[in-house]
Amino acid sequence: MTDSSFSVPKPKPLKKGSLVLVNREAYESSLEALASDALPPQYIFEGPGEILMVKGDYAQVRWRRPVPDVWLRIDQLKAWAE
């Protein structure tokens, strides 16, 4: 068999309505983390948040809490699995 016969399934692209959580490693080393509070809230890493809108490389996320919606880079998000 050749290497091309083994394909790793690609994750589904994140889109409007997707449930997500923040990838801690990607977020903590980002410009967005530097511009925010030094200690991010734990709920963003636990999820789920819902993507409301996608524009370019960013997604607007709404959390199931009484907090404002936030814009985060899509590469900082990962799909939420129960």
From Swiss-Prot:
Compartmental location: Cellular thylakoid membrane
Keyword Ubl conjugation appears in the UniProt entry: no
InterPro entries: NdhO
Main localization (coarse): membrane
Origin: domain of life: Bacteria
GO molecular function: oxidoreductase activity, acting on NAD(P)H, quinone or similar compound as acceptor; quinone binding
Pfam families xref list: NdhO
EC number: 7.1.1.-
Catalysed reactions, as listed in the record: a plastoquinone + NADH + (n+1) H(+)(in) = a plastoquinol + NAD(+) + n H(+)(out); a plastoquinone + NADPH + (n+1) H(+)(in) = a plastoquinol + NADP(+) + n H(+)(out)
A cellular-component GO term for this protein: plasma membrane-derived thylakoid membrane
Keywords carried by this UniProt record: Membrane, NAD, NADP, Plastoquinone, Quinone, Thylakoid, Translocase, Transport
Disulphide connectivity of cysteines: none
Membrane topology: Peripheral membrane protein
Family: Belongs to the complex I NdhO subunit family.
HAMAP family in alphabetical order: NDH1_NDH1O (MF_01354)
Function: NDH-1 shuttles electrons from an unknown electron donor, via FMN and iron-sulfur (Fe-S) centers, to quinones in the respiratory and/or the photosynthetic chain. The immediate electron acceptor for the enzyme in this species is believed to be plastoquinone. Couples the redox reaction to proton translocation, and thus conserves the redox energy in a proton gradient. Cyanobacterial NDH-1 also plays a role in inorganic carbon-concentration.
Record's subunit section: NDH-1 can be composed of about 15 different subunits; different subcomplexes with different compositions have been identified which probably have different functions.
Protein name per Swiss-Prot or TrEMBL: NAD(P)H-quinone oxidoreductase subunit O
Gene designation per UniProt: ndhO
